[in-house]
Amino acid sequence: ANINLHAFELAESGHPMTFFGKSDIIIGGMDLGIHALLSTLYWGGFLVGRAISSFFSKISAKTQLTVTTLLATILAIISMLTQNLWYLVAIGLLHSTMWSCIFSLAIKGLGKYTSKASGVFISAVFGGAVFTLIQGGLADIFGSWRWTWCLTVICELLMLSYALFGSRIRPKDIIQ
């Protein structure tokens, strides 16, 4: 949703988004606009990523999470600097594989407590709503969405640090 609001802001400032050179999309006489397309492609990328992530099962979750968070961080920074929202749309593809990696790393070695930990972990999805609200507040404070994506970069870097350091399991951490 925040990608759409940023697209509206760019259009109003005289920098409309285009898709194959068109700044509007008319289907069945209805102007769907680029804004709807951005969201559709983000979630479409998410779906495609989930579908192809099974092919990466031979690659460790730690490696997958490291690579995807690094790429997502780079894309978010490029998007902020260039004001090109297509880079943010591409992050949807990367985010799709992150969820399963984080989940796998979080429950590894929990033994009989895996189901309880899974429930706690699933409830943490609420954080996505909280960070969206924080980003909206930052957009109000800054008067623009452009630099609010720093919050996304910070979150990506936190996930990167989890992949590199926080997901390590020491023998004494394993619960029997």
Where are these regions (language model features)?
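Extracytoplasmic gate region of multi-pass secondary transporters
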Residues: 1-39
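Short hydrophobic/small-residue motifs within alpha-helical transmembrane segments
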Residues: 40-47, 125-127
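Multi-pass alpha-helical transporter architecture, strongest
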Residues: 150-176
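Structural signature of the two symmetry-related core transmembrane helices
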Residues: 63-78
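Helix-to-loop junctions at the C-terminal end of transmembrane segments
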Residues: 48-61, 139-140
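A membrane-interface helix-boundary motif in multi-pass transporters
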Residues: 134-156
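Helical-face signature of the major facilitator-like transporter fold
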Residues: 84-96
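Intracellular juxtamembrane helix-capping segments at the cytosolic ends
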Residues: 96-114
